[in-house]
Amino acid sequence: MPLEKLKDLHLDEQNMQPETREVNGILMSKMMSENWDKIWNFQAKPDDLLIATYAKAGTTWTQEIVDMIQNDGDVQKCQRANTYDRHPFIEWTLPPPLNSGLDLANKMPSPRTLKTHLPVQMLPPSFWKENSKIIYVARNAKDCLVSYYYFSRMNKMLPDPGTLGEYIETFKAGKVLWGSWYDHVKGWWDVKDKHRILYLFYEDMKEDPKREIKKIVKFLEKDISEEVLNKIIHHTSFDVMKQNPMANYTTLPSSIMDHSISPFMRKGMPGDWKNYFTVAQSEDFDEDYRKKMAGSTITFRTEI
């Protein structure tokens, strides 16, 4: 059953808030943890493309860019279904009769484009064995945190984040779904030169979408005209995507995602964290950040 049919199920909102469990030290929903053996044993294919990110790091944006490239800028083809059905979210597990990510992925003909938020050590090993291409997108911690906080408030399938102050501490401790942001971005960074991985930064994509989309085109071994490239830049701009029901999750009932609390696509601007962190919170966060990121060669911009 597609996600849009959720409104027909008359789901109890109180029951949508998930129980959580840890799998190998990483927090997941109880349903994901119960399905973990199947997720771990998922069979990737050599022609799969995996879009991997930490939550709220530009995943849907990258999915739309990739879909437009694969379909040579054909907007109609990219409107064929919502993002969830076009690019199965491999670990996301939903109660029957809804389609979980694995169900959708296993039914999908090749070549498949898939999505994950899994940290690198939790990625099903078949992706490495089959040498599937992977695009990883990283976003600076403070903006990621604020976006994840508001997403957790509006998405009834995620744990209640509490206040922003409480959530900052939860985020720093890595006690959110998919675990520590710090370990996630560093883990994928450390393997980027050992596999077919294109590692991108959200801030770079915002600063110069044309340059970054060209990197994706090259990685996918595609050849597109300047006209198609400009069409992709326009169609995947924040303002256009915010109005696209096949990408902005507005087709879901408010019992699942309540856009009156916060839209799925909120602002998307690097540096927006400054509107939410107090000076003290920012200084405390920065001190903790330096300790957790010590020794890593990865660098982030917190504004552009």
From Swiss-Prot:
Query: What's a Gene Ontology MF term here?
Result: aryl sulfotransferase activity
Family affiliation: Belongs to the sulfotransferase 1 family.
Q: Provide the taxonomic classification.
A: Eukaryota, Metazoa, Chordata, Craniata, Vertebrata
User: What's a Pfam family in this record?
Assistant: Sulfotransfer_1
- Tell me, what controls this protein's activity? Inhibited by 2,6-dichloro-4-nitrophenol but not by triethylamine or tetra-n-butyl-ammonium chloride.
What protein name applies here?
Sulfotransferase 1C1
Main enzyme class: transferase
Which species does the entry assign this protein to?
Mus musculus
User: Subcellular localization, per the record?
Assistant: Cytoplasm
| Record has Ribosomal protein as a keyword | no
Give the SUPFAM superfamilies listed for this entry.
P-loop containing nucleoside triphosphate hydrolases
